[in-house]
Amino acid sequence: MANFKGHALPGSFFLIFGLWWSVKYPLKYFHQKGLKKNRLSLQQQRIEIIEGAVKALFAVIGILAEQFVPDGPHLHLYHENQWTKLMNWQHSTMYLFFGVSGIIDMLTYLYFNIVPLGLDRVVLAMAVFVEGFLFYFHVHGRPPLDQHIHSLLLFSLFGATISICLEVILRDNIVLELFRTTLLILQGTWFWQIGFVLFPPFGTPEWDQKDMDNVMFITMCFCWHYLVALCITAINYSLVYCFLTRVRRRAEGEIIGIQKLKSDHTYQSTLLSGSDEE
C-alpha cells in the first residue's frame, strides 16, 4: 500500500519481533550458559514453535491487507492488458517469504530429527534477501528523497542477510543474534519513518522530495535510528541479566534457608535423643 498505513503495518511487525528477540536471546543465552549441555528445553522448543506460528500469521495478515484494501488488486495480477497494483504485489511477495520462514521455523522444532539444523536460518536469510531485492527495484524513477530513504533500508537488510547466513554455521551465537536483533528493530522504526516522511499523517506539511538538505538529514536520521536500536537491545539485555540474577539469588537464599531449617531440626532431634538417654 502506497500510503502511511502500508508502511506502518510492516514496521509494526518488524518492531514487535525485534523487541521480542531483544528479550528472548538474552534469556536463552543466560539459560544455556548455566547448563552443562547446550540443548533446548521443551519449553524453549514450544516458544520457537509459537514464534514461527506468529510470524506466519503476521505474514497472512500482511498479504490480506495488501490484496483486499479498497484500492487493492484483490488477487488480480493482470487485468485489461495491464499489470494491476504491482506495488501491492511486491509487498505481498515480501510477506509470502516471511510466511514460509515462519512455517519452516515450526517444522524445524516440531520435527528436529528430520529437518536439517540450520534450515530455519537459511530460509530466514532468503526472506530478508528477497525483501532487499524487491526494495532495490522498488523506487526506480521516483524523486531523490523517496529513492534515498528506501535505499538506506538496504544496508540493514543485506547486513542482516549476511549475519543470518553466518548463524547457519555459528549456531546460537549471541553476538550475531543480537546484531540481527538491532537490524530488525532498525528496520521496524525505519518503515515508520518512511511513512512519516513520504505520507505525513495528521495534516503535517509534506517534505520537499527534491531538496538535498532533506536527503542529508534523512541519512543522519538513519544513524540515529540505529543508535536507538542499539540502546534498546543493550537495555533489554541488562534488564534480563538483572532479573535472572535476582531470581537466582532468591532461589539460592530459599535453598540455604531450607538447609538451615533441616540442620536445626537435626540438631534438636539429637539433643532430644541425648536427653532421653540420660
From Swiss-Prot:
TM region(s), chain numbering: 7-27, 49-69, 95-115, 117-137, 149-169, 183-203, 215-235
- The lineage's top-level taxon is Eukaryota
Q: Give the primary localization class.
A: membrane
Checking Pfam families in the record gives:
DUF716 (PF04819)
Q: Supply one GO BP term.
A: innate immune response
**Gene Ontology cellular component?**
endosome membrane; Golgi apparatus; lysosomal membrane
UniProt keywords (A-Z) are: Endosome, Golgi apparatus, Immunity, Innate immunity, Lysosome, Membrane, Phosphoprotein, Transmembrane, Transmembrane helix
Q: Which family does it belong to?
A: Belongs to the TMEM45 family.
Q: What name is this protein filed under?
A: Transmembrane protein 45B
